[in-house]
Amino acid sequence: MNLNRYDLISLRLFVSVVELGSLTLGAKEFGISLAAASKRISEMEAHVGQALLVRSKKGVVPSPAGQAMY
């Protein structure tokens, strides 16, 4: 993943998801589907080689790597 405009959007999405505690709410805030938001976060995780979010039925919280990125 190269640093470009797409990455800036992904980083802003990541921050939104962390602050809202929800991938669904983060996607809504950006006007994109849950699948698109999940794909962007997954691409970021693949780029850094670690999970950035801990997902559960109650929502999401940043992993240790996600906390460092946040």
Region locations from a protein language model:
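A broad helix-preferring feature
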Residues: 10-14, 30-32, 60
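Residue-level signal for threonine
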Residues: 35, 63
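Short helix-boundary/capping micro-motifs
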Residues: 15-31
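A short LG(V/I)-centered, amphipathic sequence patch enriched
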Residues: 45-62
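Residues within the DNA-recognition helix of helix-turn-helix
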Residues: 33, 40-43
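Alpha-helical residues within the helix-turn-helix
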Residues: 28-29, 46, 67
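Short alpha-helical elements of helix-turn-helix
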Residues: 1-20, 38, 67-70
